[in-house]
Amino acid sequence: MAATTAADAFPSTVSSDSDSDDLLLPNLLPSTTAAPAPSSPSREQLHHFQIPSLPSPITVRALPSRGLSFQLWPSASTLLRVLPATPCLLPRPPAPGSPLSVLELGSGTGAAGLALAAALPARAVLSDLPDALPNLRHNVELNEHLLASAGGAASVVPLRWGDASAMADVAVAQTASPFDLVVAADVVYYEELVDPLIETLRFFVKGKVAFVMAHMRRWKRTDKKFFGRARKLFDVEVVHEDPPLEGWRHGPVVYRFTAKKQHGKK
């Protein structure tokens, strides 16, 4: 989940929404280790994701006490499981010596982006706000040998949604290998970030570039605003739905966004 322009705390200003009970979600993950002690609120957590095509698991460090950007969320697990197993969602098949070029928005811990880099394989650019980058770089280092052995790679860049200069810098750095795919997990949560996120998608998701997003419903108003704006610019399809998580009314849903064709253009 991305770092935000506001403090990493759950917003009281939107608590009047009638469907707000899914904001705090359990980290329902296959394998987790934590240190130093279970009672410590500041402990780091190591999460491990075993992907069938890889010889060893992807490992990421989460730091829950640091805020939303440092936690692991259910949609990331869904995205890293579904996308490698569903080749039809990819804009092109990876080829030997020609991995996909992938941008992850709001990377948080980088779990999804790192897993995709190894499993597709891909050259993944993981992006978030500056405070999240040290932990992202740490997680890239944890997995760099696994990624390299699979033919993938990952790098980390700062990217504030809607910042034209920052977006241009990311695009220019990829001139030799333009992005094929943009991905994200659990990035629709604060209403004030909807417009910057839409502007970021408008910038990167063009032509044959697709955006694949795993999303967990939390706030009716925020979802309505995001999908209403998105459908004016993109064709949006549901490509996968997980069953509801235990104790919750919804499970993660995977969407695929492609740019609407302009009239008169093929």
Regions of interest found by a model, annotated:
Residues 1-266:
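S-adenosylmethionine-dependent methyltransferases
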